[in-house]
Regions:
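Nucleic-acid endonuclease domains
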Residues: 1-66, 71-162
Length: 162
């Protein structure tokens, strides 16, 4: 897990992009996470390098051509390695090579690059959670069908998929 301070420039750019984008279709929280999502992308780029592309299928293309989709959640505390990362079932068909997971503090002052996981392997190793069920690991009522994997199972680095 890598802690990254959110700079004023990162926050301004994230707010501008979020305003331009508006509410995402199928958003679990009605677009309220757009600013955090764009901050998460900036954090992932700072850690991994590459070029931000912001397509439906992926957000970042690394120098070796690896396509990365960044998944960001907001948090009130530094995440523990037992916390879970999630991929909404609606996004399970995205054409990317790796998922990268980031948490951003609710006040947008700091974020954490949590790690990565190869997309194809993620779907094999993650636990499917149906909307409305209670996640036994944390008591959370699942808002949308999703695939969960604990942070401690992530890999810190992305290895070339080419």
């Amino acid at each position: 897990m890598i802690e990254v301070v959110v700079t004023a420039d990162m926050l301004v750019e994230a707010r501008d992009k979020a305003a331009e984008m508006g509410k995402l279709r199928n958003s679990i929280i009605n677009g309220a996470g757009n600013i955090a999502g764009f901050i998460g992308e900036a954090i992932a780029q700072q850690v991994l390098g590459g070029t931000l592309t912001n397509t439906y299928d992926y957000d970042l293309v690394l120098d070796d051509g690896t396509k990365v989709d960044v998944k960001t959640k907001q948090t009130s505390v530094k995440p523990l390695d037992t916390y879970e990362c999630s991929i909404a079932n609606l996004n399970a068909t995205q054409r990317c090579d790796h998922y990268v997971f980031v948490r951003v503090k609710n006040d947008f002052t700091v974020g954490w690059y949590l790690g990565s996981y190869p997309k194809d392997q993620y779907m094999k190793d993650a636990v499917f959670m149906k909307r409305g069920t209670i996640d036994p690991s944390n008591g959370y009522v699942v808002k949308s069908d999703c695939w969960n994997l604990p942070i401690h199972q992530l890999k810190e680095h992305i290895y070339a998929t080419q």
